[in-house]
Amino acid sequence: MPTTFTPNSPASSCSIHHRASPSRGARNSVRFTRPRAAAAATNSVLSAPSSVPPAYVPPPPPPPTKMFPEAGDAAAAKAAARRCGKKKDGLNFFQRAAAVALDAFEEGFITNVLERPHALPRTADPAVQIAGNFAPVGEQPPVRSLPVSGRIPPFINGVYARNGANPHFEPTAGHHLFDGDGMVHAVRIRNGAAESYACRFTETARLGQERALGRAVFPKAIGELHGHSGIARLALFYARGLCGLVDPSHGTGVANAGLVYFNGRLLAMSEDDLPYQVRVTADGDLETVGRYDFDGQLGCAMIAHPKLDPVSGELFALSYDVIKKPYLKYFYFDADGTKSPDVEIELEQPTMIHDFAITENFVVVPDHQVVFKLGEMFRGGSPVVLDREKTSRFGVLPKHATSSLEMVWVDVPDCFCFHLWNAWEEAESGEVVVVGSCMTPADSIFNESDEHLESVLTEIRLNTRTGESTRRAVLPPAAQVNLEVGMVNRAMLGRKTRYAYLAVAEPWPKVSGFAKVDLATGELTKFEYGEGRFGGEPCFVPMGGAGAAASPARGEDDGYILSFVRDEAAGTSELLVVNAADMRLEATVQLPSRVPYGFHGTFINAGELATQA
């Protein structure tokens, strides 16, 4: 029988109980039954109490958040117009006539003939994709002195930043969650206090032009670009570009997925563009510095999950192209930001490669079954296709390779990993071990399916000597749960790790908690947010702050987990601080406004903040 648990007690497993609270309605409470030493169950569950003591009086609720934020003040709109877009009063006669004609073509033919008569699939229906707490919010300037219950460990000094999709304009056609404009949410913590919270759009060239025009004009890569209407929208966009109504030369990306701090810069990324540099100001605000090309060295898009080697300080990255060869390129930056030459990796067809992995000496590149076939649009379908005839494989390439001829490919049939959590080398067997979440159906995020989605935490072993592979589910069948978005202790990235901290993606696509998984034994410890409470990616902050290395005296799990949580019934948002070793709640930070569910985050320590470029 599972044990129950009281926060800040030595128990190691618990079950959730509820009791009425006069101040907040239903809240979670738990009771201690046995000490940690007696716990031997393979799986345990910890609950997240509302974490607000009875004496706590929450701050007044903020004004209702508008479903879609307005363009901002007049000065910001004028600045955006000068940077990126042209308002109609700045167009010549030909451009004004072209704008009217193209707008009429969009409304009369694309919208009324190609799109309106056809129901949208759930994967492109904005009523589904951005409903509830997936809906966007407006920007929030820094709000200071956030209420805290519990105790924030004093070594956590810095900023927790998390990226996400937040459409600035209400969709008028198809929209996928991944299509939204990038917005970064940031909580500044110092000396046990939560000093501030802020959220800001990443000011991409795309967003600047759309603000200047007063509406969305750039195609949405997933929600709109399918079938004949997708072809028409692409043609419309190119026509507007030829007429000088929009300028795609400054990038078309949304910078809504990943965040990495490298060489003095916080970079916001999506795989359709160069990264954008975002600076954290002294008062906890966020400002976009601009599109970052590494001082003129980077001329192509970069995926949203580059890998920072914790030992060498190098940043490793991929870039894929859906139109022309080479479909995939690999490169890296040394610790000072100097870029290597590209290594062109030969692929037979353009392939979605959202993530990859590094070991101490190699990069591990997935070449899986989700591919791009633009010709499917002419047949009325989506260009993102599950190619069942293709054999999935992983490529193992030396980190400092100069040619793809050094790549060793190993087949791993029927495997699709949207994310890879870590990889390492095992000298005795000559194998490269990869840990990722294998998703079925592989294209379920992009194409509607009646098949139940599963995301199985999997260990994949690649024998580069024999070209053979093996795989096993890390969790036993009885404990299987969908695990997505998360991380290992990044101080050990590319080296053998025992633990991974991953979001419990149930009920999909919401996240009801996170899990600490022992990758060797399959032991699972869940931290559940509680009934009606959902969050996102758990962010591991090692003891000593981001960048602190694990050591024999400091265990791999010696640190804390940060995670945003939304209480949908109470209408409140919080930042939880959870002990990563025993999975006990340490502190809860009450946030002043709604934080939508988002994607990936990172922690920037105080030393890094002080040396921002």
Swiss-Prot record:
Chief location: plastid
Subcellular location: Plastid, Chloroplast
Binding site for Fe cation: H305, H354, H419, H600
UniProt cofactor note: Binds 1 Fe(2+) ion per subunit.
GO molecular function term, any single one: 9-cis-epoxycarotenoid dioxygenase activity
Bias type Pro residues, positions: 51-62
Record has Plastid as a keyword: yes
Any single Pfam family the record assigns to this protein: RPE65
Region ranges (Disordered): 1-62
Named cofactor requirement(s): Fe(2+)
Biased composition (Low complexity): 37-50
Coiled coil location: none
Any GO BP: carotene catabolic process
InterPro entries (UniProt xref): Carotenoid_Oase (IPR004294)
Reaction it catalyzes: a 9-cis-epoxycarotenoid + O2 = a 12'-apo-carotenal + 2-cis,4-trans-xanthoxin; 9-cis-violaxanthin + O2 = (3S,5R,6S)-5,6-epoxy-3-hydroxy-5,6-dihydro-12'-apo-beta-caroten-12'-al + 2-cis,4-trans-xanthoxin; 9'-cis-neoxanthin + O2 = (3S,5R,6R)-3,5-dihydroxy-6,7-didehydro-5,6-dihydro-12'-apo-beta-caroten-12'-al + 2-cis,4-trans-xanthoxin
Keyword Oxidoreductase: yes
Record field: compositional bias (Polar residues): 1-15
Similarity field: Belongs to the carotenoid oxygenase family.
Name of the protein: 9-cis-epoxycarotenoid dioxygenase NCED5, chloroplastic
Gene: NCED5
